[in-house]
Swiss-Prot record:
One of its GO terms (molecular function) is ribosome binding. Residues 97-170 form the PRC barrel domain. Its main location: cytoplasm. The keyword Nucleotide-binding does not apply. It comes from the Bacteria. It is found in: Cytoplasm. Keywords: Chaperone, Cytoplasm, Ribosome biogenesis, rRNA processing. This is Ribosome maturation factor RimM. The gene is rimM. GO terms for cellular component: cytoplasm; ribosome. It holds the Pfam family PRC_RimM. One of its GO terms (biological process) is ribosomal small subunit biogenesis. An accessory protein needed during the final step in the assembly of 30S ribosomal subunit, possibly for assembly of the head region. Essential for efficient processing of 16S rRNA. May be needed both before and after RbfA during the maturation of 16S rRNA. It has affinity for free ribosomal 30S subunits but not for 70S ribosomes. Binds ribosomal protein uS19.
Length: 170
């Protein structure tokens, strides 16, 4: 699958809201309401069935987003969708700003130190609140703060490489 055709997981249906077909939606976008900007959605049910949806809209409601999907008007339909994952094609996301990256684009890149020591590949990233952390898996797992330019010196997609200023023994 080409990179721009890859599916990016943005959220999940976590329940019904009220009795008129509104949906409680968990979003992993930043900000979380940005999920509504990226459409069409590819919905994947827990049993693997997929459908495409365009026209989802919603609002913030504290812990979750509350969404409305075209054609869904009752709670029973929503409850049957519990656990459904919301994806978009990578091409639906706008290009990131300079020195900003989508985590999914970093996954799988090789990681080397500024001295050329191979540490492994980017497995995934997570946020600590203070900064993001890149998890590198190689001969062992390392967690490196994704802080530009202090620890992460460069990201080169053409070379499939992230260069870090990091002690390979740490």
């Amino acid at each position: 699958m080409k990179d721009n055709e890859r599916r990016i997981l943005l959220g999940r249906i976590v329940g019904a809201f009220g009795v008129r077909g509104e949906i409680k939606l968990e979003s992993w976008t930043e900000p979380r309401s940005a999920i509504f900007r990226y459409q069409p959605w590819i919905l994947r049910s827990p049993n693997g069935q997929e459908s495409t949806l365009e026209g989802a809209r919603g609002r913030d409601s504290g812990k979750h987003l509350v969404a409305r999907f075209p054609g869904i008007e009752d709670r029973d339909t929503v409850e049957a969708m519990h656990g459904t994952e919301v994806y978009v094609a990578r091409s639906a996301l706008p290009p990131p700003n300079a020195d900003e990256y989508y985590w999914v684009d970093l996954e799988g890149l090789d990681v080397k130190t500024t001295e050329g020591v191979a540490l492994g590949q980017v497995s995934h990233l997570f946020s600590t609140g203070a900064n993001d952390v890149v998890v590198v898996r190689g001969d062992r797992e390392r967690m490196i703060p994704f802080v530009l330019p202090e620890f992460v010196k460069s990201v080169d997609f053409e070379a499939n490489l992230v260069v870090v200023d990091w002690d390979p023994e740490f």
